[in-house]
A protein has these predicted regions:
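Active-site-adjacent bridging/hinge elements
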Residues: 93-94, 175-179, 262-270
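Short helix-capping/linker segments at secondary-structure and domain boundaries
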Residues: 129-130, 177-182, 208-213
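Conserved short loop/turn motifs at secondary-structure junctions
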Residues: 1, 109-111, 188-193, 267-270
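Short, residue-level hotspots on alpha-helical faces of the histone-fold
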Residues: 124, 173, 177, 199-203
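Amphipathic alpha-helical segments of the small helical/lid subdomains adjacent to P-loop NTPase cores
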Residues: 164-195
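Intrinsically disordered, low-complexity regulatory segments
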Residues: 1-169, 173, 250, 260
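Long, highly charged, low-complexity internal segments
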Residues: 35, 43-84, 192-270
Length: 270
């Protein structure tokens, strides 16, 4: 039996219909020598500081730099503690059973860095050693799936893609965990979240918000010239803007006296 793992149930159903896996089981579809299963996005991620013995926010703990990152099922917060998501744990058990029974694995997670990481984290967390190949497609039509299955690629070709995603994941953890705790301790009240991506994004939003609040409308003038060519009337606007009417009028007189205009751009609209 071959196992095909997709990133989400809807994709798995599309692949299953192509390979003839139409018998529904708990967490997968089976038939014609295939078991088509799925993740729900990231089933496995990096463990929180508590897994390394660091409880609470304490200055003496910082920076938290794990010698080796631990993988755990996706967790949800209950009160002040994180617990494994029960639905994720169930699906991981389904995957463990299928991986143990299969001859090989076809990786059908999304064709990209995060899709690669989703599978590799599950594969490593379960301690799987079965060989795997990659279904690399950007379309989910039946034709694209069949073509991709005829041209499966060696999983090792995507090792560097996985390492890139792994480095991103660990960098996010190091920056997010340590910076958030340091910021919260420095502020002295509440919990403040800081992240490698979220904080620069928030800074851009705040900057735009301040610009909007500080914006003061001002009046400016542009020159409009109406003319005709080949019996077609049209108007031309100057690119330059003038802060006062006097400057605009002076430039208009200059153009009027010269009698010539230079067309710098043309836009066609229907």
């Amino acid at each position: 039996m071959k196992v095909i793992i997709a990133e989400k149930p809807s994709v798995a159903q599309g692949i299953a219909s192509v390979v003839g896996a139409r018998q529904r089981k708990d967490g997968y579809l089976t038939g014609d020598g295939y078991a088509v299963t799925w993740a729900f996005g990231h089933l496995v991620g990096l463990a929180m500081p508590e897994s390394y013995g660091f409880s609470g926010f304490r200055r003496e703990h910082l920076p938290i730099l794990p010698q080796e990152f631990r993988l755990v099922p996706r967790q949800v917060r209950e009160g002040k503690v994180y617990k494994d998501d029960p639905g994720v744990v169930r699906q991981l058990e389904v995957l463990r059973e299928l991986f143990d029974r299969c001859e090989s694995i076809i990786v059908a997670t999304d064709a990209g860095r995060e899709g690669e990481l989703i599978f590799r984290y599950v594969y490593n967390y379960l301690g799987c050693t079965k060989p795997f190949v990659r279904l690399w497609i950007s379309s989910l039509t039946d034709k694209a799936i069949r073509e991709g299955l005829r041209n499966l690629r060696e999983g090792s070709l995507y090792d560097n893609l996985y390492l890139s995603a792994k480095a991103r994941s660990e960098a996010d953890w190091l920056v997010g965990i340590n910076s958030s705790q340091a910021l919260s301790l420095a502020a002295g009240q509440g919990v403040f979240s800081l992240g490698r991506v979220q904080t620069p994004t928030l800074a851009m939003i705040c900057s735009r918000y301040r610009e909007n609040k500080q914006f003061k409308p001002r009046t400016y003038f542009r020159i409009k010239v109406s003319t005709a060519k080949d019996g077609i009337d049209f108007s031309a606007w100057s690119q330059d803007r003038f802060d006062d009417l006097g400057s605009a009028t002076a430039k208009f007189r200059e153009v009027e006296n010269d009698g010539k205009l230079v067309v710098t751009s043309v836009e066609y609209r229907e």
